[in-house]
Regions:
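Mid-domain alpha/beta scaffold segments of enzyme catalytic cores
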Residues: 1-268
Length: 268
């Protein structure tokens, strides 16, 4: 029924019951999960998570997240390149720019973020891989960098920008990740934007264990998981006046096209 294009399934939050989380997702129609990295010290854990036998297809992506810029070292970029060259990574990610927190706006760390992003975009070009992009308070800067270092394709994770920014990303060959924000009553601008975009402009994502759907949070939930993608599907279906099945199938087609995922068996 659906592919979760962004879930940190390797996270320690899932250590106690990862198999049960996967089973619940599979029971609700999730057919595959893209698992992006964020720090070099998690690369091995992520690789092992995606390699273990599972009810679902698990696809790894490797990258250095901008929020951890202070911890990233030059050798981590080399480690990333080794993984891209020797594993079945489907994307470079989660990478990007973040100016949301005050410390990330420090001139030295901001420059380092840009340098790391440029290096990782170059790796994506070298290995002909799409990218999974993170941006907070930095859409304009990210668009500018992408115009200089054009990726082959990719996803703008958790998009919540303006209409002109959405079209700028689409013009660069990217699509927009739609997650739990779409379920929030305050997300009217995002819903209005999605109504005005082509039907192949977005993919679905949980961002689990983060970004809880509004209904789950209101009910006292504290950990997101891929099965909750159903809430995002329902909210987007209502927004677009389409059926949930149509939304899930359209998103799966777009995810497979953008990330060039292998075909799934009908039984999966």
């Amino acid at each position: 029924m659906a592919i979760d294009s962004h879930c940190h399934l390797d996270d320690d939050a899932f250590a106690p019951d990862r198999d049960a989380v996967i089973a619940r997702a599979q029971a609700l129609g999730v057919r595959g999960i893209v698992v992006p990295a964020y720090r070099a010290d998690c690369f091995d854990r992520l690789r092992d998570c995606c390699a273990r036998p599972s009810l679902l297809s698990l696809w790894p992506a490797y990258g250095l997240h901008p929020c951890y810029v202070a911890a990233h070292e030059t050798e981590h970029v080399s480690r990333l390149e080794d993984l891209l060259a020797t594993t079945d990574a489907v994307a470079v990610g989660e990478i990007g720019l973040d100016r949301h927190a005050e410390d990330l706006r420090h001139p030295g760390l901001w420059r380092r973020q840009q340098d790391l992003l440029a290096a990782q975009l170059q790796l994506a070009q070298s290995y002909d891989l799409p990218v999974i992009l993170h941006a907070r308070s930095a859409y304009a800067e990210l668009i500018s960098m992408l115009r200089r270092h054009r990726p082959c394709a990719g996803v703008v994770h958790a998009f919540n920008g303006r209409l002109e920014q959405a079209y700028a990303f689409l013009d660069l060959g990217l699509v927009l990740g739609v997650g739990g924000v779409i379920t929030q009553p305050s997300a009217q601008r995002l819903r209005d934007i999605l109504r005005r975009l082509p039907q192949d402009a977005w993919v679905l994502e949980s961002d689990a264990p983060d970004m809880l759907p509004y209904e789950v949070y209101r009910a006292g939930g504290r950990r997101n998981e891929p099965s909750f993608l159903a809430y995002n599907i329902a909210a987007l279906a209502q927004t677009l006046e389409r059926s949930p099945v149509w939304v899930a199938q359209q998103a799966e087609q777009t995810t497979r096209r953008i990330l060039r995922l292998p075909a799934l068996d009908a039984s999966e």
